[in-house]
């Protein structure tokens, strides 16, 4: 070993003439460890897109407003005393301090109406006529599109590797998929030709099982997008065959090697989310790469089935096992920030909302539906200026009283 090191030192000694003939070849060898990879990095930092974050700031207010909706409508005569708000809001886990629920309702006079009870002479709260109309329009829109909801649920169950999905997981994501409250009857039991409810073998959970897979429903939303791109923009068929619509957020750094990696990934073949891959050998590196791209296609299709092209990351995780999705979903989605966007606005950063980027343009859904439009009417009421609302004298005194208490504290 000593002899080897001595000879190596003599060879690399710059004072010796022999080094001039060997050093160039050494430089060529040293280039390899520092060469850039042409694969998409596994770990990437999240780049904020303020358009989606601002959208979620409004959604955060709407989420609390909807909870108060349900609270008020559950009371007799659909009214509630202001004095009971603190206790009931604490039970709902809304995170309000003392007197904050009443102050919150005052911010949205187009949704909540505070008035003095004519007999008891105490303040009560009820929904405004505009808010009640919005609830009625959304309810009617959900009922009118039950045939579409049946199709969405069929496609969702068809994506499962077992042909069944837990009923409770669908119930939790009912609002995102535009299903009515009684979907177990109106969507599942009312269509026995498509679904059947079965009990779990080891648990008491119920499962939604598909009766028969329909090949006509196995066409993904991204395939229709590719056809439009091919026909309208004249893009080469080979370039668009396995590609996704990629639109990176502002400020996302795209280097030369990253661009090459995306170019290679766009042309990588993959299995359809509706294809049964249980009999395939997935041990090779190429099969693993195809499986990862299939996971992107599964999440893309899952978001395409939602009414607003968005869903929380936590609810995607419910379908992880039945759709063969990766364990670390957040890190996986951050690899594809040109396709998806994860917003952490809402619930103090604990809630992660995943958007399908191609589904939105300038803060609005590209292809709006009746349910989405009905829900946006509530957003308009929330964002409407309080100055345009008619506020009676008793309400003004109540608001001034809250301000005085804040000053004392």
Swiss-Prot record:
Q: Which GO terms describe its molecular function?
A: RNA binding
Annotated tissue distribution: Expressed in roots, hypocotyls, cotyledons and shoot apex.
Q: Which InterPro entries match?
A: PORR_domain (IPR021099), PORR_fam (IPR045040)
What outcome follows a substitution of residue 152 to W?
Answer: In rpd1-2; impaired in adventitious root formation at the restrictive temperature of 28 degrees Celsius
User: Per the database record, which ranges form the PORR domain?
Assistant: 47-386
Q: How does a null allele present?
A: Embryo lethal when homozygous.
Q: What GO biological process term is on the record, naming one?
A: negative regulation of cell population proliferation
Q: What PANTHER family is this protein classified in?
A: PROTEIN ROOT PRIMORDIUM DEFECTIVE 1 (PTHR31476:SF9), PROTEIN WHAT'S THIS FACTOR 1 HOMOLOG, CHLOROPLASTIC (PTHR31476)
Q: What is this protein's function per UniProt?
A: Involved in pre-arranging the maintenance of the active cell proliferation during root primordium development. Does not seem to be involved in cell cycle progression.
Which protein, by its recorded name, is this? Protein ROOT PRIMORDIUM DEFECTIVE 1
Query: What is the name of the gene encoding this protein?
Result: RPD1
């Amino acid at each position: 070993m000593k002899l080897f090191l001595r000879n190596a030192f003599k060879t690399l000694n710059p004072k010796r003439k022999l080094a001039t003939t060997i050093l160039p070849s050494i430089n060529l060898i040293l280039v390899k460890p520092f060469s850039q990879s042409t694969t998409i990095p596994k770990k990437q930092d999240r780049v904020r897109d303020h358009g989606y974050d601002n959208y979620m700031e409004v959604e955060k207010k709407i989420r609390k407003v909807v909870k108060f909706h349900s609270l008020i409508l559950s009371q007799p005569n659909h009214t509630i005393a202001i004095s009971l708000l603190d206790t009931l809001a604490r039970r709902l886990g809304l995170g309000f301090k003392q007197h904050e629920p009443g102050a919150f309702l005052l911010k949205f006079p187009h949704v909540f109406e505070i008035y003095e009870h004519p007999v008891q002479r105490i303040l009560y709260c009820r929904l405004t006529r505009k808010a009640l109309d919005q609830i009625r329009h959304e309810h009617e829109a959900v009922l009118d599109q039950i045939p579409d909801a049946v199709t969405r649920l069929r496609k969702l169950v068809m994506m499962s590797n077992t042909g069944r999905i837990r009923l409770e997981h669908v119930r939790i994501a009912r609002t995102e998929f535009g299903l009515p409250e009684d979907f177990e009857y109106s969507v599942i039991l009312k269509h026995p030709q498509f679904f059947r409810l079965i009990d779990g073998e080891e648990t008491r959970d119920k499962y939604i099982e598909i009766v028969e897979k329909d090949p006509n429903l196995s066409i993904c939303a991204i395939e229709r997008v590719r056809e439009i791109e091919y026909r309208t923009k004249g893009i080469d068929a080979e370039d668009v065959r396995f590609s996704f619509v990629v639109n990176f957020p502002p400020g996302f750094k795209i280097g030369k090697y990253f661009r090459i990696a995306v170019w290679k990934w766009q042309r990588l073949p993959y299995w359809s989310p509706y294809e049964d891959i249980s009999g395939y050998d997935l041990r090779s590196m190429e099969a693993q790469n195809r499986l990862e791209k299939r996971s992107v296609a599964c999440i893309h299709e899952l978001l395409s089935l939602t009414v607003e092209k968005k869903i929380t990351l936590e609810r995607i995780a419910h379908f992880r096992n039945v759709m063969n999705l990766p364990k670390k979903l957040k890190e996986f989605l951050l690899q594809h920030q040109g396709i998806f966007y994860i917003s952490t606005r809402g619930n103090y950063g604990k809630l992660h909302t995943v958007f399908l980027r191609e589904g939105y343009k300038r803060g609005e859904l590209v292809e709006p539906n009746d349910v989405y439009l009905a829900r946006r009417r509530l957003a308009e009421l929330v964002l409407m200026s309080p100055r345009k609302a008619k506020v009676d004298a008793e309400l003004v005194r109540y608001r001034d009283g809250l301000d005085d208490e804040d000053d004392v504290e």
